[in-house]
């Protein structure tokens, strides 16, 4: 017999289901993800640190978990919510079940609940604090706790590397500032011949310049960009001296460093099917996204930044470039994993930008 578990929201509503994963019951911000596949990459994405993910696709876990598709060494989300979790996955690469991996990493979950109802609630009311309990009589107490608890402010500190390390390439040298990077960013750079040095988010502009890289990549990561003040100062210190490319949180920090402002979205963009229009080419890419904050488009008017991409669903800013300096960013995930690879040409654009900048510097110094 399956053990009962309850998902409780801060507004007092609750959902009865059955136990999935760990008994280490947690609280966090509940969000929803609309991707149909890629649950392993999703639960291991550091951008979900501290959050509870509701999967809108009704069956999760049907192809198991393998060791190669993790986007981080240790998942740092606070829970998952699914309609049905497969207990008997079938795939030639499968090594563990979803339940096994959640239990291993002390992540609780719940299955057998109406995920459509939960998703509608989040869409209507915005993201909420939520938690799990295995005892119905504890629900009222948990609601009070959720209404009072303060969630962590700086999740980047939890997931950023503590010491620099290198992923070897043969050509251009890139410093990747780790705000909670997905591993596929490193892979996309490596496959283009880049030697990647991953550094902590607290690394200063002076320390980066001393490494003399050909370019700087600002990674994705969790939480509110305004909290990561040290990175804003770092970006201001390297802008114009080295080409750089920002993704997701890196995109937001780039905008803030130039005087723009951000805002918390009602329920964010999380999924692998978000259409984005490239304003320079007129083309539309289907993109992978995972963010709960966005850049205020009106705040860009007094900056030297130009909007290059817009979300077709709600018109929010999805891409920026500096008007005169070699720097650009996107809000979505061109490295995918999960999701479509429509936009991985942006890594080629970054390599071309670094090569051109390096050649220009060579002529100036000749």
Curated annotation (Swiss-Prot):
InterPro entries: Anth_synth/Amidotransfase, CarbamoylP_synth_ssu, CarbamoylP_synth_ssu_N, CarbP_synth_ssu_N_sf, Class_I_gatase-like, CPSase_GATase1, GATASE. It catalyses: hydrogencarbonate + L-glutamine + 2 ATP + H2O = carbamoyl phosphate + L-glutamate + 2 ADP + phosphate + 2 H(+). CDD domains: GATase1_CPSase (cd01744). Residues 1-171 are annotated as: CPSase. One of its GO terms (molecular function) is carbamoyl-phosphate synthase (glutamine-hydrolyzing) activity. GO terms for biological process: 'de novo' pyrimidine nucleobase biosynthetic process; 'de novo' UMP biosynthetic process; glutamine metabolic process; L-arginine biosynthetic process. The active site is at 248 (nucleophile), 333, 335. The keyword Ligase applies. Belongs to the CarA family. Small subunit of the glutamine-dependent carbamoyl phosphate synthetase (CPSase). CPSase catalyzes the formation of carbamoyl phosphate from the ammonia moiety of glutamine, carbonate, and phosphate donated by ATP, constituting the first step of 2 biosynthetic pathways, one leading to arginine and/or urea and the other to pyrimidine nucleotides. The small subunit (glutamine amidotransferase) binds and cleaves glutamine to supply the large subunit with the substrate ammonia. Composed of two chains; the small (or glutamine) chain promotes the hydrolysis of glutamine to ammonia, which is used by the large (or ammonia) chain to synthesize carbamoyl phosphate. Tetramer of heterodimers (alpha,beta)4. This is Carbamoyl phosphate synthase small chain. It comes from Staphylococcus aureus (strain MRSA252).
């Amino acid at each position: 017999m399956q053990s009962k578990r309850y998902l409780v929201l801060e507004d007092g509503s609750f959902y009865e289901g059955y136990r999935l994963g760990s008994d280490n019951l947690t609280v966090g911000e509940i969000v929803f993800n609309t991707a149909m596949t890629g649950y392993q990459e999703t639960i291991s994405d550091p951008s979900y640190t501290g959050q509870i993910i509701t999967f809108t696709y009704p069956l999760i876990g049907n192809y198991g978990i393998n060791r190669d598709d993790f986007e981080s060494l240790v998942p740092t989300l606070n829970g998952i919510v699914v309609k049905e979790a497969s207990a008997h996955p079938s795939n030639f690469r499968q090594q563990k079940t979803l339940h096994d991996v959640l239990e291993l990493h002390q992540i609780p979950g719940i299955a057998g609940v109406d995920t459509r109802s939960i998703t509608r609630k989040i869409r209507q009311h915005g993201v909420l604090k939520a938690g799990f309990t295995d005892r119905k009589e504890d629900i009222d107490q948990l609601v009070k706790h959720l209404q009072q608890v303060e969630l962590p402010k700086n999740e980047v500190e939890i997931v950023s590397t503590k010491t620099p390390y290198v992923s070897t390439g043969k050509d251009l040298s890139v410093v990747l500032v780790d705000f909670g990077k997905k591993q596929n960013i490193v892979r996309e750079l490596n496959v283009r011949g880049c030697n990647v040095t991953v550094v902590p988010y607290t690394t200063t502009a002076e320390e980066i310049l001393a490494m003399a890289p050909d370019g700087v990549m600002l990674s994705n990561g969790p939480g509110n960009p305004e909290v990561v003040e040290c990175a804003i100062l770092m970006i201001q210190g390297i802008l114009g001296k080295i080409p750089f490319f920002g993704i997701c949180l890196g995109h937001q920090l780039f905008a803030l460093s130039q005087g723009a402002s951000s805002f918390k979205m009602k329920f964010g963009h999380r999924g692998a099917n978000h259409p984005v229009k490239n304003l320079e080419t007129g083309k539309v890419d289907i993109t992978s996204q995972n963010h709960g904050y966005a850049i205020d488009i009106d705040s860009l008017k007094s900056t030297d930044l130009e909007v290059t991409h817009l979300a077709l669903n709600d018109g929010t800013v999805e891409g920026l470039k500096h008007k005169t300096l070699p720097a650009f960013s996107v809000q979505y995930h061109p490295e995918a994993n999960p999701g479509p690879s429509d936009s991985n040409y942006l890594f080629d654009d970054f390599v071309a930008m670094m090569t051109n900048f390096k050649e220009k510097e060579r002529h100036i110094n000749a």
